[in-house]
């Protein structure tokens, strides 16, 4: 595989998702990432299902090394400082002010390494009236207005994965790469800051654009209505998702697949504005038709007519999808102690080369000896060869 960030050294002082997700993005592209964790307990995500190797922890910690250090202790701080002196990037996702308490604030680390790109991830920003508040995924989704677009008012429940956590980490990685690019010209590092609140507000850009442009406050069904998106149950109990968008050819294809060319004779459904205005009636019509055939039958018909669709899979169905297999989307890893595991590879390919070689998440302090004196003498320690 192509490791476009090979030679880049990253120290991650992260917990849960945002910090670990940021460094995972860099590790997936070949960066050497050392995860600094508290001795004994490590990243709190480790213990979410008992033990210290939960699936929650595994999700965002592949392709990394782990060292157990308490930077409040002078002897551990010496090792930490050696890592910082040789690092390109430092990532933390503490509440504002806590990094300074554990001797990992920007000013101190910058004195050790002026080329260091220092990334600070927070819930609400480094200053301001909400800066000190605790924040987790749902908090950021709610504060940014995004959660209001997901929750069904008739049955208000938080749904879905930790989007705010993951997206904040991905934005952080994006900012880090920008600072590294600038450093090539200046020779100096930058402080990169991103908060979950800001990240999710930006991720929710469409809703704010509608607000500021036309005064529309979007709700859960605003975008699906305009994009003409539907989820429909089939005779077998499986579901299909359609996203018809604007081109009329897709609607003609759907009518052909349903063997219902007469659908356009109804003025409510004859045009895009009509279909949007009469969405509930259209969903009722489509729902009745789709319950007449099995999902596989519908998929074959929709493929033949070039209609934008996909089976609405359960997670356990996705690995069996023919395209997922073709793309080698799921890869196996092996840890000498924890055994075999499977994960989703990086979605990025470079010159057609996919990231198929993935190192398993490390056990707590697994690489203490390797980094006891700082970075190994080689330019970049190949974690993938080590775990092969």
Predicted region positions:
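Mid-domain beta-loop-alpha active-site segment that forms a flexible
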Residues: 162-177, 196-204, 246, 250
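Aromatic-enriched alpha-helical interface/lid elements that frame and gate functional surfaces
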Residues: 228-305, 309, 380-381, 387
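Terminal low-complexity tails and localization/encapsulation signals of metabolic enzymes
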Residues: 1-9, 233, 317-388
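Flexible glycine/proline-enriched surface loops and loop-helix/loop-strand junctions
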Residues: 154-164, 233-238, 353-356
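Conserved Rossmann-fold dehydrogenase catalytic segment
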Residues: 126, 153-163, 184-199, 219-224, ...
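Oxidoreductase and adenylate-handling cofactor-binding alpha/beta cores
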Residues: 169-189, 202, 206-212, 255-260
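N-terminal helix-loop segment corresponding to the beta1-alpha1 unit
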Residues: 1-185, 215, 363, 367-388
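Glycine-rich beta-alpha junction loops
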Residues: 40, 124-125, 196-201, 236-238, ...
């Amino acid at each position: 595989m192509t490791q476009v960030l090979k030679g880049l050294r990253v120290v991650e002082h992260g917990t849960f998702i945002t910090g670990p997700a940021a460094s995972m993005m860099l590790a997936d592209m070949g960066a050497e990432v050392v995860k600094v964790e508290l001795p004994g307990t490590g990243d709190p995500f480790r213990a979410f299902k008992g033990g210290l190797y939960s699936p929650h922890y595994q999700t965002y910690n592949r392709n990394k090394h782990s060292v157990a250090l308490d930077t409040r202790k002078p002897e551990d701080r010496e090792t930490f400082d050696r890592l910082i002196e040789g690092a390109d990037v430092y990532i933390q996702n503490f509440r504002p002010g806590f990094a300074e308490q554990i001797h990992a604030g920007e000013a101190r680390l910058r004195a050790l390494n002026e080329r260091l790109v220092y990334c600070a991830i927070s819930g609400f920003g480094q200053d301001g009236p909400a800066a000190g508040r605790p924040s987790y995924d749902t908090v950021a989704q709610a504060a940014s207005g995004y959660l209001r677009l997901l929750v069904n008012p008739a049955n208000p429940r938080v749904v879905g994965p930790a989007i705010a956590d993951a997206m904040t980490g991905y934005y952080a990685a994006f900012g880090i790469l920008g600072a590294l690019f600038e450093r090539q010209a200046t020779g100096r590092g930058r402080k990169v800051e991103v908060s979950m609140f800001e990240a999710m507000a930006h991720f929710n850009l469409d809703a704010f654009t509608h607000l500021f442009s036309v005064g529309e406050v979007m709700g859960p069904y605003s975008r699906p209505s305009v994009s003409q998106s539907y989820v429909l149950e089939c005779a077998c109990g499986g579901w299909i998702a359609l996203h018809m968008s604007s081109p009329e050819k897709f609607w003609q294809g759907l009518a052909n697949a349903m063997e219902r060319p007469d659908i356009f004779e109804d003025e409510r459904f004859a045009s895009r504005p009509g279909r949007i205005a009469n969405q509930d009636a259209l969903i009722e019509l489509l729902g009745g038709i789709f319950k007449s055939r099995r999902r596989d039958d519908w998929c074959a018909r929709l493929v033949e007519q070039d209609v934008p669709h996909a089976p609405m899979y359960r997670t356990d169905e996705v690995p069996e999808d023919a395209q997922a297999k073709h793309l080698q989307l799921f890869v196996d890893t092996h840890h000498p102690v924890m055994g075999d595991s499977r994960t989703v590879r990086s979605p990025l390919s470079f010159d057609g080369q996919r990231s198929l070689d993935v190192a398993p998440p490390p056990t707590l302090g697994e690489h203490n000896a390797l980094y006891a004196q700082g970075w190994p003498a080689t330019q970049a320690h190949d974690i993938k060869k080590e775990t092969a």
